[in-house]
């Protein structure tokens, strides 16, 4: 089996003397930013930021931070293999395997950064907890001559912001509900006023056009569906916190 081959490969590899990840990263000066810092910077000028999600493509596909691009330092299969070795064999061997997988992506990473016009942008990297994956990807980016920052606490810290915000009672803004029959032009009206008034478009956040049309308009335009409740909450939070009209013109 593939697992048997993987374990044979690891058993025949000498990992003695491999430094810890902490030791490897200690020679790099990488700035740390909080989720709040990143949201503020995105709101000020999101075009000046390249926000990189270092998690696997599966994790990224389920939900992510707003405006982020995915560069999996470990893809789905590599993450599975590394986790298997970590649990069943040894932490040192798992680290060695993860670094081997990651280092093989150096040229792909270089092209990814060039494609995203990174020379004119601030690079910020995050993973699930703000640990090994984001740290190592930031190291690789540094080795290519850039100066990335890492998000402390990772995606989990962003989710805490979202959960805390929607758990507030009462809701921090007074809301006016726009109602009407399907096809009466509610969405068009929201779009018209969104430049001057704060707007929450629930249908857009859910990628769902009412009980009559459902996801059909989004399918026609090849818009990715919202995979889960977490992604829906993230979309709502993004609509509020990256929209300056919420802070400048909130209706009281």
Label for each model-derived stretch:
Residues 32, 51, 68-70, 148-150, ...:
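Conserved beta-strand scaffold positions in the cores of enzyme catalytic domains, especially
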Residues 145-160, 204-206:
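A short glycine-rich beta-strand->turn/loop micro-motif centered on a GG-aromatic cluster
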Residues 78-85, 158-163, 209-215:
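Short, charged, surface-exposed secondary-structure boundary motifs
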Residues 42-117:
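Positively charged, proline/Ser/Thr-rich regional signature most characteristic
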Residues 174-195:
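Glycine-rich phosphate-binding P-loop
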Residues 198-252:
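Conserved nucleotide-sensing/catalytic segment adjacent to the nucleotide-binding pocket
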Residues 1-66, 163-170, 175-179:
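Flexible, polar/low-complexity N-terminal or interdomain linker segments that lie immediately upstream
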Residues 1, 96-152:
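Catalytic cysteine-centered active loop of the rhodanese-like fold, especially the PTP/DSP P-loop
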């Amino acid at each position: 089996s593939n697992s048997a081959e993987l374990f044979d490969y690891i058993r025949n590899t000498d990992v003695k003397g491999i430094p810890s990840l902490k030791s490897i990263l200690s020679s790099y000066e990488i700035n740390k930013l909080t989720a709040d810092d990143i949201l503020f910077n995105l709101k000020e000028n999101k075009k000046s930021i390249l926000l990189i999600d270092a998690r696997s493509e599966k994790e990224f596909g389920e939900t992510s931070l707003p405006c982020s691009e995915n560069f999996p330092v470990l893809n789905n299969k590599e993450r599975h293999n590394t986790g298997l070795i970590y649990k069943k064999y040894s932490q040192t061997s798992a680290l060695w395997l993860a670094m081997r997988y990651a280092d093989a992506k150096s040229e792909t990473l270089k092209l990814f950064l060039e494609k995203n016009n990174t020379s004119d942008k601030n690079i910020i990297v995050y993973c699930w907890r703000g640990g090994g994956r984001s740290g190592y990807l930031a190291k690789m980016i540094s080795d290519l001559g850039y100066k990335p920052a890492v998000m402390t606490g990772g995606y989990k810290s962003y989710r805490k912001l979202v959960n805390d915000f929607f758990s507030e009672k009462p809701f921090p803004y007074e809301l006016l509900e726009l109602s009407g029959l399907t096809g009466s032009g509610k969405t068009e009206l929201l779009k018209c006023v969104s430049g001057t008034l704060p707007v929450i478009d629930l249908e857009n956040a859910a990628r769902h056009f009412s009980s009559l049309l459902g996801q059909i308009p989004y399918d026609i335009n090849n818009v990715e569906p919202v995979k889960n409740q977490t992604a829906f909450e993230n979309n709502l939070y993004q609509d509020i916190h990256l929209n300056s009209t919420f802070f400048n013109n909130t209706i009281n």
